[in-house]
């Protein structure tokens, strides 16, 4: 018994927090992981910040599988236990923490046992978690389920969730509202995520469960409490993705401000746009086009700080001198970047094995033809492996590729790939007449806006 107490105290010591306040301001969680061959040495406690999980504390797991948290709770809300299962949706352990709670958890592989001196609303929350877990296999990466399995099950799953929501009727109105929102969000977010996962069988584009159509409304996102849920932002993101792939009218990335017509709450707009910008990998030109439309909605201090850093990174290479590389053409003649001084230079980094690269070739040919004789050079620089040099030469000849055709010396280990942090292709680079960088992640030939940019440069 003393050994158990000793190890449990150690787990609390590892949690970095101040105990200046009264014990009544804290919630206590004591846990034991009872999973055979369990290896994880640390457990994370998440809270929620702006609709996403955020680390609140960590605790070491002792050799007996025990861990513990004594966490300050300034406002009641959802927290999440992660022992390695959280991201892959193996088991949701969501707790509604309030001051003075004293919770015990015994965690098994597929469920957990809840007990303690004061568990608050968490018996009800556990039932909500069980519903989430039933949806999880359909939203898990690597799952073998398809629409053949999911569609017949969905109506039953939704009905069960709706029936459960009717039983949420405690004396705490705020809790009732938040848990009902959580259940609805779990169901919808898991369903929309299903359509983002790779599958072995696919329904027709217009073959969608009828229940999903009832979730689509003109003013979809109105409740700022969505930002109190770990999957709040994910729901918004997955919803707009689902609508786009289902053939309904939804804005493309550069028209993303139009999606805000479906979001009425200012805080939701702010957080959603921040997530879009952070994850969309926009080119400089794309961002500059959309920025004036979205910045008026990104009003929080967090978003303003984010945009400041985002723009700094986006423009970090602009104006810097381009790498003066030298590589051979198909006749083994060395060609250097400096040979093009005085002209604009557009470089296509590609390889013969790259499908998306080859899809750009017709567009590249056309743009080279249309800008022939103008003050711009088009360079195609292959990142094929050195052993495939002849394969590259044969491809260039067979496809009658125009412009300047070069091959790097060490594929992705070559100086040009390392200098511009190239880890995926196709990748395009654009330089001014002095050899300085205009964009080290330029627009593709297939993007009509590239022509607008080139025309503007050539007129200046």
Model-derived segments and their meaning:
Residues 202-216, 251-259, 286-295:
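Alpha-helical repeat scaffolds
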Residues 266-328, 333, 338-343, 369, ...:
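N-proximal helix/coil linker or "cap" segments that precede and/or mark the start of modular domains
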Residues 424-425, 436-460:
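Non-catalytic, surface beta->alpha helical segment in thiol-disulfide oxidoreductase systems
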Residues 375-389, 401-412:
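Thiol-based oxidoreductase modules, predominantly thioredoxin-like and allied folds used
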Residues 341-342, 349-366, 380:
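Conserved redox-active cysteine motifs that mediate thiol-disulfide chemistry
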Residues 21-178, 182, 189-193, 200-204:
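A non-transmembrane, solvent-exposed segment enriched in polar/low-complexity residues
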Residues 328, 393-429, 433:
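Short, internal strand/loop/helix patches
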Residues 1-26, 457-460:
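Bacterial Sec-dependent N-terminal signal peptides
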């Amino acid at each position: 018994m003393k050994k158990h107490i000793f190890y449990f105290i150690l787990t609390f010591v590892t949690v970095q927090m101040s105990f200046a306040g009264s014990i009544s301001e804290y919630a206590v969680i004591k846990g034991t992981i009872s999973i055979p061959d369990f290896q994880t040495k640390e457990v994370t406690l998440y809270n929620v910040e702006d609709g996403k999980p955020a680390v609140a504390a960590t605790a070491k797991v002792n050799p007996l599988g025990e861990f513990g948290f004594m966490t300050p709770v300034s406002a009641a809300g959802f927290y999440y236990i992660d022992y390695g299962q959280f991201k892959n949706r193996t088991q949701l352990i969501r707790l509604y923490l309030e001051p003075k709670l004293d919770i015990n958890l015994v965690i098994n592989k597929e469920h957990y046992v809840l007990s303690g001196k004061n568990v608050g609303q968490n018996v009800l929350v556990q039932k909500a978690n069980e519903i989430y877990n039933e949806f999880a296999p359909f939203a898990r990466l690597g799952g073998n389920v398809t629409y053949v399995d999911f569609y017949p099950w969905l109506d039953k799953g939704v009905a069960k969730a709706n029936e459960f929501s009717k039983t949420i009727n405690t004396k705490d109105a705020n809790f009732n509202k938040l848990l009902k929102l959580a259940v609805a969000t779990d169901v919808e977010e898991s369903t929309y995520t299903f359509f983002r996962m790779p599958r072995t069988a696919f329904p027709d584009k217009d073959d969608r469960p009828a229940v999903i159509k009832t979730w689509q409304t003109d003013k979809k996102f109105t409740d700022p409490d969505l930002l109190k849920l770990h999957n709040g932002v994910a729901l918004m993101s997955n919803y707009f993705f689902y609508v786009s792939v289902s053939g309904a009218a939804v804005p493309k990335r550069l028209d993303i401000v139009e999606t805000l017509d479906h979001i009425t709450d200012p805080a939701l707009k702010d957080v959603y746009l921040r997530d879009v910008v952070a994850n969309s990998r926009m080119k400089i030109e794309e961002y500059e086009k959309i920025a004036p439309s979205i910045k008026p909605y990104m009003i929080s201090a967090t978003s303003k700080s984010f945009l400041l850093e985002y723009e700094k990174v986006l423009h970090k290479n602009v104006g810097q001198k381009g790498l003066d590389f030298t590589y051979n053409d198909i006749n083994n003649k060395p060609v250097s970047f400096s040979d093009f001084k005085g002209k604009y230079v557009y470089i296509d980094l590609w390889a013969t094995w790259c499908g998306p690269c080859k899809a750009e070739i017709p567009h590249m040919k056309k743009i080279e033809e249309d800008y022939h004789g103008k003050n711009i050079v088009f360079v195609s620089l292959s990142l094929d492996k050195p052993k495939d040099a002849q394969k590259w030469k044969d491809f260039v000849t067979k496809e009658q590729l125009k412009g300047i055709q070069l091959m790097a010396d060490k594929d992705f280990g070559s100086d040009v790939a390392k200098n511009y942090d190239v880890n995926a292709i196709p990748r395009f680079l654009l330089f001014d007449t002095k050899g300085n960088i205009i964009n080290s992640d330029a627009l593709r030939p297939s993007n009509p806006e590239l022509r607008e940019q080139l025309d503007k440069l050539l007129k200046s």
